A protein has these predicted regions:
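Enriched for short, Lys/Arg-rich terminal
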Residues: 1-8, 72, 78-129
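Arg/Lys-rich, positively charged N-terminal/basic patches that mediate binding to nucleic acids
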Residues: 1-51
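A short acidic, often aromatic-flanked loop/helix-cap motif at beta-alpha or helix-coil junctions
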Residues: 18-21, 68-70, 116-117
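Generic, well-ordered alpha-helical segments
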Residues: 34, 38-41, 55, 69, ...
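A short, surface-exposed loop/turn module that caps and links secondary-structure elements
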Residues: 51-84
Length: 129
């Protein structure tokens, strides 16, 4: 187990995760001010998740066997911005390494929309690499 001096677990990103963040937080020149405010809140929420995972790599719920057995040891966080009503629209899927015992690394596999199981598909692809 290798914690840094602050007692936090390092968070690393699978290839493509930063692109995921860019996709869901992109603003077009024609977007209205409400969209810009939503994107700002979403960026803030993602930053909070990073801090939460560093402090507690078990913050997400264990996925377990189910529709995606290859993600059984992964964890997921359902999240959205505070003003959004209804089901959270986004998922963070990550894996603690090693998966048993005290993790030395929190590997984010994806941050993507819930719709169409996009987050799960991306995590599946990246977990094989």
């Amino acid at each position: 187990m290798t914690f840094d001096s602050s007692g936090e677990v390092p968070v690393t990103f699978a290839q493509g995760v930063l692109n995921d963040v860019g996709e869901i937080t992109a603003i077009s020149p024609g977007d209205n001010p409400e969209r810009a405010a939503e994107v700002k809140a979403l960026k803030h929420r993602i930053a909070e998740l990073l801090v939460e995972c560093k402090a507690n790599p078990f913050v997400g719920e264990l996925m377990g066997p189910g529709l995606h057995p290859e993600l059984a040891t992964c964890r997921r966080v359902r999240f959205d911005i505070p003003s959004q009503k209804g089901k959270p629209r986004f998922r963070l899927i990550y894996r603690n390494e090693p998966s048993d015992g005290a993790p030395s690394e929190c590997l984010w596999l994806t941050i993507a929309p819930r719709a169409g199981l996009r987050a799960h598909r991306k995590a599946q692809q990246r977990s094989r690499l």
